[in-house]
Every structure is written in C-alpha cells, then in structure tokens.
C-alpha cells in the first residue's frame, strides 16, 4: 500500500510540473519517456558544444527501465503476441522487473518475474506489491543450469499458454526503446 501511495504522490508532483506546460495525461503510462532534458554545464565546461542528460527519475518507476518495459509490451501488442489474459515473463535483478510489473499491472496482464537470489528483499517486495509472481532462483549456478533465472523464465514461457518472455538482455527492442522515446 505504501508503494501505491508513494507512486500516486510522485505522479501528482510530476503532473503539477507538467500541467504548468498545459499538458495532461490519461494515465501514468503516458508519463513514461516524457522526462526533462537537463543541460550539463559544469562537467562539460571544457568540451565544445552543449550536452544534456535525461532526468529519468521523472518516469513513474524512477528508472529508464520504464521505457523498455512499455516499449516492448506495446510492440508485443502490435504484433498480436499479447491479448487479454496474457502473461508477461521476465528475468530481473530488480529495476526492469519493477517496470515490467508496473506496466503489466496497468495494462491488465499477469506478470511473472524470475529473480536472482542476490536481489534485495525490498525490491522483491515492491514487485510483489505491483502484482508480480516472483520465482527466486539461485545466483550461484551457470546460466544454462535449469535452476538459473534465465532457464526458469524460458521454462515458464514454454509451459504457460499465452505468455511472452521479454528477454531484455537479448531483445533488440530494449535498445530501440531509448531511441523511440
């Protein structure tokens, strides 16, 4: 519950800022990628040109991982891979999982995350608060071991009808998301 209250307060703060520009949004997903550019002055003062950075903390999940989660799920919807009742499956150490869980919840999909045993309990609990089912997998096994979070995600994807495995580490949409948004 505390997480929901926090997210709502943060979104209210973001909306206050964005409404000053006469912009409004239909839902929290429309805030993803609409992060401000900040000019870097001090760290680039000895370099020619102007340099900017995106302030990713203004994404609802406070991370650039929101961009990839939304972009990959939107593309899967366009391709007909996701429909009502579909399940999203992903491997994560936390940030991407949080974003995938948040976007899945808001789009109405079930979310299953295979998480390394190195992930903090706080991150795991936050993902659970967003409705994700969590499979904690040992971190001290090779990636091709059936118990690894990679292999658990692959197995679940094969076993669960109407599921989509995002596979962020090998998905070209991961990189594309940062150019598109």
Place the predicted regions along the sequence by residue.
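PLP-dependent amino-acid enzyme catalytic core
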Residues: 6-181
């Amino acid at each position: 519950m505390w997480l929901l209250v926090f997210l709502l307060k943060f979104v209210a703060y973001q909306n206050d800022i964005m409404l000053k520009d006469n912009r409004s949004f239909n839902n929290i997903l429309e805030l993803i990628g609409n992060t401000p550019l900040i000019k870097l002055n001090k760290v680039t003062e000895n370099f020619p040109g102007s340099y900017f950075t995106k302030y990713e903390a203004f994404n609802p999940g406070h991370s650039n991982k929101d961009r990839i989660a939304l972009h990959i799920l939107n593309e899967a919807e366009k391709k007909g891979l996701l429909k009502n009742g579909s399940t999203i499956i992903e491997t994560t150490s936390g940030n991407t999982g949080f974003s995938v869980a948040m976007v899945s919840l808001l789009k109405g999909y079930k979310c299953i995350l295979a998480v390394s045993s190195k992930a903090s309990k706080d991150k795991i609990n936050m993902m659970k608060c967003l409705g994700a089912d969590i499979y904690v997998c040992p971190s001290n096994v090779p990636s091709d071991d059936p118990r690894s979070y990679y292999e658990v995600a692959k197995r679940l994807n094969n076993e669960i009808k109407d599921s989509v495995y995002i596979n962020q580490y090998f998905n070209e949409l991961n990189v594309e998301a940062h150019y598109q948004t």
